[in-house]
Design a protein with these regions (language model features):
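Amphipathic alpha-helical repeat scaffolds of TPR domains
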Residues: 178-193
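Amphipathic alpha-helices of TPR/Sel1-like and other helical repeat/solenoid scaffolds
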Residues: 161-172, 205-214
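Short coil/turn connectors between adjacent alpha-helices in alpha-solenoid helical repeat scaffolds
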Residues: 155-156, 194-203
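Sec-dependent bacterial lipoprotein signal peptides
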Residues: 1-8
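N-proximal helix/coil linker or "cap" segments that precede and/or mark the start of modular domains
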Residues: 210-256
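A non-transmembrane, solvent-exposed segment enriched in polar/low-complexity residues
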Residues: 8-166
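Structural signature of alpha-solenoid helical repeat scaffolds
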Residues: 173, 177, 199-202, 219
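Short coil/turn linking the two alpha-helices of tandem helical-hairpin repeats
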Residues: 190-197, 239
Length: 256
């Protein structure tokens, strides 16, 4: 992941306030995920003795931020609404699984970061579950007298976990076209398993439809523009491949 250093400058801003336990003088880094640059480092802070520190970020548009501990193994993804401050409590060594997110002031209105946190925690739990099934298979594949049955059971269990994630990802994309949650969700994967498989025509069509809705609501947002470009390019390539294969078989192309 490319990382650049960037200063926020003096402009209208909002606050991301952290209350971190077990920080032990270790720093936290806040990145902005840029559509054309990747992760750009905004600031790095050490929580005070009470575990508190505050980042200030621009509040002029929808943006995506990544909060990371010093090992950079797990990123807590945040998508605050403009002018919406956030208060985050978490354990330093388990940012995602232990985090709670609260908009400041408390409000009944949409808080995308809270919605996205729930999905990140669901992903983290799914990773642990899949790892458990994988370990069970690896530890017993040479000992079990019913290898085929064991493999089938583990595969079926993993497929069930992925299917649950897939259904939730589609729901989030469908219900959050006014913010940037779909941009994050579309790229989620567990190992080499993408939650939403862009090679599936139906999935690609669904995501294109969601992105078109996002484009109508946020036509100038760089993340939305880039996502629309990427999905349209994949769709164009797929259609060209279908035409090529049909021409090879002598069939008449019937592509919508």
């Amino acid at each position: 992941m490319p990382v650049l250093l960037c200063a926020c400058g003096k402009q209208p801003s909002q606050t991301v306030e952290l209350n971190i336990s077990h920080a032990r003088k270790r720093a936290l880094a806040l990145f902005e995920l840029k559509a054309d640059q990747g992760a750009v480092l905004l600031d790095s802070l050490r929580p005070d003795k009470k575990g508190v520190c505050r980042f200030r970020v621009p509040c002029d548009s929808l943006r995506i931020y990544l909060l990371a501990s010093s090992d950079n193994e797990h990123f807590l993804c945040l998508t605050p609404m403009p002018h919406q401050d956030l208060r985050i409590s978490a354990n330093y060594d388990s940012l995602v699984s232990s985090a709670t997110v609260q908009p400041i002031p408390a409000t009944d209105s949409l808080c995308p970061s809270l919605i996205l946190l729930a999905y990140q925690q669901q992903i983290a739990q799914a990773e642990r579950t899949i790892r458990s099934y994988t370990d069970t298979w690896m530890e017993n594949r040479y000992q079990s007298t019913q290898v085929d049955s064991l493999h089938e059971a583990c595969t079926r269990a993993i497929d069930s976990v992925m299917d649950t994630l897939r259904q939730e990802a589609r729901r989030l994309c469908r219900q959050n076209t006014a913010n940037l949650i779909p941009v994050v969700v579309i790229n989620k994967a567990i190992g080499n398993r993408r939650v939403l498989d862009l090679s599936e025509p139906e999935t690609l069509a669904f995501l294109l439809d969601c992105t078109k809705q996002m484009q109508r609501l946020n036509p100038q947002n760089p993340h939305v523009k880039r996502l629309m470009f990427q999905l349209a390019r994949i769709d164009s390539y797929r259609k060209q491949e279908e035409i090529r294969l049909l021409e090879q078989t002598g069939e008449e192309p019937q592509i919508p």
